[in-house]
Amino acid sequence: IIDLKLPQDVINIIDRNNWKDEYVGNQPAFCIYLGNDNGPFEDLAIVEKLIKDGTMILPVFFNDFSKEIPEELKKQNGIKYDDNQQSRIANIVLQAFELLRSTRKVFISYKRSESTSVAIQMYEALESHHFDVFLDTHSIEKGELFQEELWHRMTDCDVILLLNTPGFLESHWCKEELAEAGSKQIGIVQLVWPNHKINAISHLSFPLNLESTDFVNTIYDDKDKSKLKNNKVEEIVQFVESVRARNLASRQDNLITEFMSIAKQCGRDITVQPERYLTEVISGKKIIYVPTIGIPQSFNCQAADIRYEYDKNPQNTRIRLIYDDLRIRDKWLKHLDWLNNNLKKDIFTLKKQEFKKWLETTK
C-alpha cells in the first residue's frame, strides 16, 4: 500500500476476531487461508460463507497442500509459503482489488555476445512464475517489425531486467534500450556482473551485485555456458516481483504530474483523489481521469472505485483513460481511436500528446 502511495485505510483487514462486526458480503473482499497440518481445520463456517458470496480465496500452505488445506478449498489454486513469497502474496491481493495490474510484464535487456545463456535462463524462470516475459529472440513473431515491436513491448512492461555485463554499454542497441527506458521512466533491476561497476543509469534503478560464486562452476563470462545457481535465480525472481508496485506507482506519479501541470496551464480545476484517479466537474458533469500505465485496456476503468463513481450518475459522468502513447505501435493507437469513435458509453482514451489540445478545447 505504501509503495503504491495509497491511503492506509484503502484495505480493511478482517480476521476471525472482528469478522462478525466488519465483514459485509456486498463489498469487494479477498481471503488468505493459512494451512494447518495439525488439524482440525479452523474457520470453516467463514470459508463456506465466503465461497457462497463468491469471494476469492487464496490457500497458503507450508509443506503439503493436500494435508493442510480443507476439502472446501481443494479446487483453489494455492501457493506454498516461504519468506521469498511475501511480495508475491501481497501483489496477488492488490491485483484482486485492482490496485495493481494483474499482467506481470518483464522486459529482459542484455548483450547477446555476453549473456545469452543467462538471459534465456531468466526468461524461463520468470515464465515459470507466470510473468509475461519479453526476450527479443523468443517474443517477436516472424514478419513483425522487429524494432517497432520491441519498443512497443518495453512501453507496456512493469519492470526491465537488465543484465549489466562489462560490454553492455558498448552495444548501440543496448544503449538505445537504456535511453528508451529513461524516456519512459521505467524502473530497472540491474544484475551487475562480477568485477563490473554499477552504472548510475536510471532514475529508478535496483542493483543486485553478482559474485562469481553465484554462477554454476563460477563460469560467468561465457555467453553460451554461464548459468546462475538456482537459489540466485529464485532470489532475482522475487526481487523483480518486489519492485513492480514501486515502479508502476512511480510511472503513474509522473503521468499524473504531467497531466495536472498541463491542466493548470489550461485553467482547469482537477482534483487528485486518494485512490489515485482524478476528477473534474464541468457544467454539472463529472469527468473521471484514470492514469493508465502501458497500453490502455478496458479493465482500467472497471476498478471498484471507478465503477462506484460512474454508477452513481452514469448519465452525467465521463471517463477518460489518460496514457503515454510514446512508442506504442501505430496499429494499436488506431485501434484505440476506433474504440473512441464506436463505444456507446462516454468512456474514451486520451493520449499524452493530445493532453493540451483536449484540455484547451473541451468544456
Residue ranges and their predicted role:
Residues 1-5, 38-39, 51-128, 194-363:
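C-terminal interaction surface of TIR/SEFIR-family domains
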Residues 2-24, 122-152, 166-172, 292-298:
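Conserved BB-loop
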Residues 26, 36-55, 166-186, 199-200, ...:
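Conserved TIR/SEFIR loop-to-helix hotspot centered on a Trp-containing motif
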Residues 28, 157:
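An anion/phosphate-binding loop that grips the pyrophosphate of nucleotide cofactors and donors
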Residues 34, 60-63, 163, 191:
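Generic beta-sheet signal
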Residues 35, 108-112, 135-137, 164-165:
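Short glycine-centered, acidic/aromatic-flanked micro-motifs in structured strand/loop junctions
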